[in-house]
Curated annotation (Swiss-Prot):
Top enzyme class: isomerase
Similarity comment: family membership: Belongs to the eIF-2B alpha/beta/delta subunits family. MtnA subfamily.
GO BP field: L-methionine salvage from methylthioadenosine
One annotated GO molecular function: S-methyl-5-thioribose-1-phosphate isomerase activity
Family annotation (HAMAP family): Salvage_MtnA
InterPro entries according to UniProt: IF-2B-related, IF-M1Pi, IF_2B-like_C, Initiation_fac_2B_a/b/d, M1Pi_N, NagB/RpiA_transferase-like, Rhodanese-like_dom
Function per UniProt: Catalyzes the interconversion of methylthioribose-1-phosphate (MTR-1-P) into methylthioribulose-1-phosphate (MTRu-1-P).
Organism field: Leptospira biflexa serovar Patoc (strain Patoc 1 / ATCC 23582 / Paris)
Record-listed substrate binding positions: R49, G50, A51, R89, Q197, N248, K249
EC number assigned by the record: 5.3.1.23
UniProt keyword annotations, A-Z: Amino-acid biosynthesis, Isomerase, Methionine biosynthesis
Active site per the UniProt annotation: D238
Site annotation Transition state stabilizer: residues: C158
Record-given protein name: Methylthioribose-1-phosphate isomerase
């Protein structure tokens, strides 16, 4: 039976209410986003994250920007709003596609009030479409699993649930759909360093819904595949090139290689907006580099007073350097299938499946 889901993005007509994912699971706190500038900070600082959720939030952000203006618009100012939001997080293609569509929808619209209404309507439309796409994707993915098997053990990476989308989720959407079909699902959630989206967010979502879940460290998947029967690895993604190379949260590539070695099917769950047919291979996907302090002191984790839980020198020597790419590229050869709202298909079929969409 379907369970209630989170609504991490809520539009309140004059402001945007965002569930602050930086403070989960400690507390459920909503940010009241009043301006485009606050939206950009929320995206950049990962109060909201996940490619679909970022895209929706970005369109609400430019809506807020337009609402603060008055009189007649001009193309330069419209482009400025769009450019500022785009630069908040460049890897996920969903945001880029959404902003291009937003620009197209206001061509010939000359008043800021009218532009704000067009963008507000578009953002609300995106929320409905994303939820519907995720629910269809989830069912398509669930149908890949054997009907005569009642229990499945699945590894996930990062957070790909309702918190990362308008609802239901992509990879976690498949898990929810299996649950709704009456199957027992045991989830092994990679903690996903350094931002800990798996241990903080995926485990939180699964526990809220009563789905059995174990947190594992990012280096534990090989041991797990050797010692327990793993039926599949399910991940989301931020951008897919034409050849199937896939950008996703750092650590995905490692997990794909381990799954390949152990003959565990590795599935990428993505809505059509995550496919970028302008890019031939993953080498063309830009990789966002984030702050070193996210690695050396978990600087996104703060106590009630707003102070760092792990001050400098606590988890790494003071002055230690770190690399912090937010994403890596998983080569297409490690991916068994893409699970989408359009159906499930192998990397070689991407051009055929997406060219007329």
């Amino acid at each position: 039976m379907s369970q209630p889901e989170f609504l991490p993005i809520q539009w309140k007509s004059t402001f945007l209410s965002l569930l602050d994912q930086r403070v989960l699971p400690g507390k459920k706190e909503f940010l009241q986003i009043q301006t485009m500038e606050e939206t950009i900070v929320a995206i950049r600082e990962m109060a909201v994250r996940g490619a679909p959720a970022i895209a929706i939030t970005g369109i609400f952000g430019i809506t807020l920007g337009a609402k603060k203006k008055s009189g007649n618009s001009n193309p330069v100012d419209v482009d400025s709003l769009i450019k500022q939001v785009f630069e908040s997080r460049p890897t996920a293609v969903n945001l880029s596609f959404a902003l291009k569509e937003a620009k197209k929808r206001v061509e010939g619209v000359s008043h800021w009030d009218s532009i704000a209404k067009v963008w507000e309507s578009y953002a609300l439309e995106m929320m409905v479409q994303d939820l519907k796409a995720n629910q269809t994707l989830g069912k398509n993915g669930a149908d890949l699993f054997p009907k005569n098997q009642n229990e499945f053990h699945i590894i996930t990476h990062c957070n790909t649930g309702a918190l990362a989308t308008a609802g239901h989720g992509t990879a976690l959407g498949v898990i929810r759909s299996l649950r709704d079909q009456g199957k027992k699902v045991v989830v092994y959630a990679d903690e996903t360093r350094p931002f800990l989206q798996g241990s903080r967010l995926t485990a939180f979502e699964m526990m809220e819904e009563g789905i059995e879940c174990y947190i594992i460290t990012d280096g534990m998947s090989g041991w797990l595949m050797n010692h327990r029967k793993i039926d599949a690895v399910l991940v989301g993604c931020d951008r897919v090139a034409t050849n199937g190379d896939t950008a996703n949260k750092i650590g995905t590539y490692n997990l794909a290689i381990v799954a390949y070695e152990h003959k565990v099917p590795f599935y990428v769950c993505a809505t059509k907006d995550s496919f970028d047919l302008k890019l031939k291979t993953g080498d063309e996907i830009p990789i966002e580099m984030r702050k070193e302090s996210e690695v050396t002191q978990f600087d996104f984790l703060k106590n009630e007073e707003g102070n760092f839980l792990f001050p400098e020198g606590k988890t790494s020597p003071i002055g230690a350097r770190a690399l912090n790419p937010s994403f890596d590229i998983t080569k297409a050869k490690f991916i068994k299938n893409f699970i989408t709202e359009l159906g499930c298909f192998v990397p070689e079929e991407i051009s055929f499946r997406l060219k007329n969409v």
